[in-house]
Amino acid sequence: MALLTGNADRAFSSYSFNKLENLCEVQTKKGFFYRKAKLLHPDEDLCYLARLDDRTRFVIINVGGIKYKVPWTTLENCPLTRLGKLKSCNNYDEIMNICDDYDVSCNEFFFDRNPSAFRTIMTFLTAGKLRLLREMCALSFQEELVYWGIEEDHLEWCCKKRLQQKEEEAAEARMYEGEMMFSETTQCAFQDNNWLSLCMRNLRDMVENPHSGIPGKIFACISISFVAITAVSLCISTMPDVREEEDRGECSQKCYDIFVLETVCVAWFSFEFLLRSIQAENKCAFLKTPLNIIDILAILPFYISLIVDMASTKNSSKPGGGAGNKYLERVGLVLRFLRALRILYVMRLARHSLGLQTLGLTVRRCTREFGLLLLFLCVAMALFSPLVYLAESELGAKQEFTSIPTSYWWAVISMTTVGYGDMVPRSIPGQVVALSSILSGILLMAFPVTSIFHTFSRSYSELKEQQQRAASRQMHQLEESTKLAGGGSSQWITAASPPDAAREDGRPELDQEAKRSC
């Protein structure tokens, strides 16, 4: 039994509970923990605790099988809490409205609540310190605070920040899941009446969600195969013999095969982009997506090259087309650069790779850390480049550091610990500067990398949980569609319920899922 001494002068627990009147009352369950306590302690004589002097000075509180002997003066300090209301109870019915059970013989109050959370709350009532438990979900602890009548404002600032963060995450997940479940329920209810919406839905699942079924997996495999073929053809097109034929204006069978292969790949990518644009509800938002912008930058150079080649052929056949050919030759350099953008097709793998999606999300979230890393690098580069130039300028035998701008390259390579060896300090002062730049580069680059690593881990966990929720939602949708297919028209009416009903039905499961994610 835990004995908690009271605090007569109220130095630690003089808190205001004016706002607790708005807290909702929680219904209690009767008799469960009283019987449990009897089973746990069958041979223990509890009546000896019910002495007359102890009953006037102490109260016994049994929470989850753990007993606390608390002075009444401690509970009087917080009269608006659930425990503080015990002092003002005048009859048995009022007591049973506050606790789960009550033993009159030994003046023991039973509460069927979490004992770990109550230990923290009891510490707050006696010492005035309220903190979250690491082993307990923050949202579950919030429910315990509401039950016992404790305000969240009394939490320590770090714990309050953690609780607010979990509340925001749970609210976002609840809203997102509610909207998704309602939209899917509505689509299932009216799929027979709207054939076009059913086709658009299946098309969206096929091109956007590889885990939606066999068509989505086949589509993703074909897309990945074409990306790999494009990367291989780009590498082959840069071979010396192919480049020589292209410079001479000749076209061998190998060059022709590469062109045909590239044409087939671009045709597939164009077809895929067209399908994605058709199923998109908001066309403007679709075009602003980074991956779609990459698709446009990778596809357009091929068509621009075809148009320019056709124009150069027409101009060369005309008598006065020499000036046009010169202009096209100038444009040829730009076209070669545009054709090199075909390597951007590799970024399309991010549609099907959780790791690449995590990398992109980490880069977007860590822009400040990357800017800080770049700032550290620039400051160190501006510091060590003049020093190594001044240290090596006295060496007249072989001076590799001809100016401060040329020393910038050496400083960057040294601080990143790459060390190509093209520029090496020869003098002892220059070597001391080089050693300092290497050590400072290791230390300066390690500071932001730690934060970036934690962001990457958190982003990966979030995307993985989101993927698992999507898979569970698809399983739920499949089960609902199976029930609707075999249940008749009465279940179709149930599936087409209004949005409020759909969200209320799914809310408890979403709350439990949000708590598990904590």
UniProtKB/Swiss-Prot annotation:
Where is the chain membrane-spanning? 215-236, 258-279, 291-311, 332-352, 368-389, 432-460
- Tell me, what is one Gene Ontology molecular-function annotation carried by this entry? potassium channel regulator activity
SMART domains of this UniProt entry?
Answer: BTB
What does the entry list under GO cellular component? membrane; voltage-gated potassium channel complex
SUPFAM superfamilies of this UniProt entry? POZ domain (SSF54695), Voltage-gated potassium channels (SSF81324)
A Gene Ontology biological process term: action potential
The residue numbers the entry assigns to motif Selectivity filter are 417-422
Which sections are embedded in the bilayer without crossing it? 405-416, 417-424
List the stretches on the Extracellular face of the membrane.
237-257, 312-331, 390-404, 425-431
Task: Report residue spans for region: Disordered.
Answer: 473-518
Composition-biased stretches, type Basic and acidic residues, lie in: 501-518
How does this protein lie in the membrane?
Multi-pass membrane protein
Ranges in the Cytoplasmic compartment?
Answer: 1-214, 280-290, 353-367, 461-518
UniProt KW keywords = Cell membrane, Ion channel, Ion transport, Membrane, Potassium, Potassium channel, Potassium transport, Transmembrane, Transmembrane helix, Transport, Voltage-gated channel
Location within or outside the cell: Cell membrane
Q: How does it assemble?
A: Heterodimer with KCNB1.
Per the entry, what this protein does is: Regulatory alpha-subunit of the voltage-gated potassium (Kv) channel which, when coassembled with KCNB1, can modulate the kinetics and conductance-voltage relationship. Modulates channel activity by shifting the threshold and the half-maximal activation to more negative values. Potassium channel subunit that does not form functional channels by itself.
| Similarity comment: family membership | Belongs to the potassium channel family. G (TC 1.A.1.2) subfamily. Kv6.2/KCNG2 sub-subfamily.
Protein name per its UniProtKB record: Voltage-gated potassium channel regulatory subunit KCNG2
Q: Which organism is it from?
A: Gallus gallus (Chicken)
Lineage, please?
Eukaryota, Metazoa, Chordata, Craniata, Vertebrata
